């Protein structure tokens, strides 16, 4: 698929099914805990400074944000999970919204699950990966913030993450940095393959 990534815009924000775009365009969802670098990932992948607003305040994305890319596909930014300063009720509401999208959306082709390369995956990260495997949703693991770790230690951190996730070697695992753009081409290759 030929894709002009510069032709990208935020299309809409949705709280439930009735607000989703009503067409056949394939979608790639982006999931990860708060402040893992989802907005930076979107901006880097689409070569934009602030198409997706980055925030110092975790838990800012509370809706599903749909980004139209060249009228050929969409990124869907899912609310960040695991942020403690949101009420339990609010978290449950997000959980239902995310689950409804991931399990019922026919346009969904794969989920990019973002984890922080510097740390072991959280219980939420593990749960998300298990959820995606259970529902047989194709998953691409993207380990962000690779620039914060010396290159010589990347393998060690990658192994620790894979072990904690009980990683399936048939899934893609990509080391990524929005600062150096490392992993950007690999991420696009993996995404386009799923479409």
From Swiss-Prot:
GO BP, one annotated term: division septum assembly
Cofactor(s) this protein requires: Mg(2+)
Repeat listed as a keyword: no
Pfam families per the UniProt record, alphabetical: MMR_HSR1 (PF01926)
Residues reported to bind GTP: 32-39, 59-63, 77-80, 144-147, 176-178
UniProt keyword list: Cell cycle, Cell division, GTP-binding, Magnesium, Metal-binding, Nucleotide-binding, Septation
Domain EngB-type G, first and last residues per copy: 24-195
UniProt-recorded Gene Ontology molecular function terms: GTP binding; metal ion binding
InterPro entries according to UniProt: G_ENGB_dom, GTP-bd, GTP-bd_ribosome_bio_YsxC, P-loop_NTPase
Coiled coil (UniProt feature): none
Keyword Magnesium: yes
GO CC annotations, alphabetized: cytosol
PROSITE patterns xrefs: G_ENGB
Residue positions binding Mg(2+): 39, 61
HAMAP family noted in UniProt: GTPase_EngB
Function: Necessary for normal cell division and for the maintenance of normal septation.
Record family assignment: Belongs to the TRAFAC class TrmE-Era-EngA-EngB-Septin-like GTPase superfamily. EngB GTPase family.
Protein name: Probable GTP-binding protein EngB
Organism, as annotated: Streptococcus pneumoniae (strain P1031)
